[in-house]
């Protein structure tokens, strides 16, 4: 009494049902599976399933099903800027699969941007008492973590290389003149300390040759004046014309 009915185990015939579907119908079925499950659960089933998941068709169907304004725009981008079918030696999945999995558009591509994982992902040079990670003195709206990198007394530097292709943006999309990359950072000073800040951005090609560079040098904060945070951005956005041949940000 009160026992729940046991779930029936699928028979061998039921297990075989999907395998017997023609590729066109199987493609439609797989296109309803969430992206991560497609890769981790469906791809290892057999060679036929692996080939479908590795190819672009199932991912195009997923994009086409999203009828939001953003979804329609992404689908149009994927159709107008098809990725090289030869793919990339480092990635078994097609470029469109990586795009759907990693969702690079509209998110922050800087890893560990607020120091919530210490200095992981950053190359740092220590000056004075060196770098540290502390809680924000004032709230930074929209930040993934209310922590920040702090320095002391002398110039300190931190750098990060962002591989846009590994983040899910395929090269043909970068070359298409249809997307923009926006760069910004938050900075500020303690009330009892002055502060000088510089932001430099280098755009590199796949061979790490510099394509173009930008910088921002806001006015220094004087001692005993304020301790608020402010946003800074180079006097540019990485507009489509500058992304030709670009694959990395530094």
Swiss-Prot record:
Asked if the Swiss-Prot or TrEMBL record annotates the protein with the keyword Transmembrane, the reply is: no
Q: Where is the FBA domain?
A: 99-250
One GO term of the cellular component aspect?
SCF ubiquitin ligase complex
Gene3D superfamilies the record matches: 1.20.1280.50, Galactose-binding domain-like (2.60.120.260)
Q: Which InterPro entries match?
A: F-box-assoc_dom (IPR007397), F-box-like_dom_sf (IPR036047), F-box_dom (IPR001810), F-box_only (IPR039752), Galactose-bd-like_sf (IPR008979)
UniProt GO BP: ERAD pathway; glycoprotein catabolic process; SCF-dependent proteasomal ubiquitin-dependent protein catabolic process
Q: Which Pfam families match?
A: F-box-like, FBA
Assembly, per entry: Part of a SCF (SKP1-cullin-F-box) protein ligase complex. Interacts with SKP1 and CUL1.
Q: What does this protein do?
A: Substrate-recognition component of the SCF (SKP1-CUL1-F-box protein)-type E3 ubiquitin ligase complex. Able to recognize and bind denatured glycoproteins, which are modified with complex-type oligosaccharides. Also recognizes sulfated glycans. Does not bind high-mannose glycoproteins.
Q: What is this protein called?
A: F-box only protein 17
């Amino acid at each position: 009494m009160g026992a729940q009915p046991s779930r029936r185990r699928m028979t061998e015939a039921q297990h075989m049902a999907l395998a017997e579907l023609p590729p066109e119908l199987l493609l439609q079925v797989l296109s309803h599976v969430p992206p991560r499950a497609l890769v981790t659960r469906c791809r290892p089933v057999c060679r036929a399933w692996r080939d479908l998941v590795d190819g672009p068709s199932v991912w195009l169907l997923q994009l086409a099903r999203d009828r939001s304004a953003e979804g329609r725009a992404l689908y149009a981008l994927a159709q107008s800027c098809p990725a090289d079918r030869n793919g990339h030696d480092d990635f078994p999945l097609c470029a469109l699969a990586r795009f759907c999995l990693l969702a690079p558009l509209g998110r922050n591509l800087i890893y560990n941007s607020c120091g919530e994982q210490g200095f992981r992902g950053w190359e740092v040079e220590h000056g004075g008492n060196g770098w540290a990670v502390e809680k924000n003195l004032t709230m930074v709206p929209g930040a993934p973590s209310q922590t920040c990198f702090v320095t002391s007394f002398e110039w300190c530097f931190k750098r990060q290389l962002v591989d846009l292709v590994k983040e899910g943006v395929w090269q043909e999309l970068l070359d298409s003149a249809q997307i923009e990359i926006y760069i910004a950072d938050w900075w500020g000073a303690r009330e009892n300390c002055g502060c000088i800040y510089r932001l430099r951005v280098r755009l590199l090609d796949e061979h790490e040759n510099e394509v173009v560079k930008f910088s921002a040098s806001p006015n220094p904060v004087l001692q005993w004046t304020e301790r608020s945070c402010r946003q800074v951005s180079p006097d540019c956005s990485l507009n489509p014309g500058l992304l030709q041949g670009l694959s990395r940000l530094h």
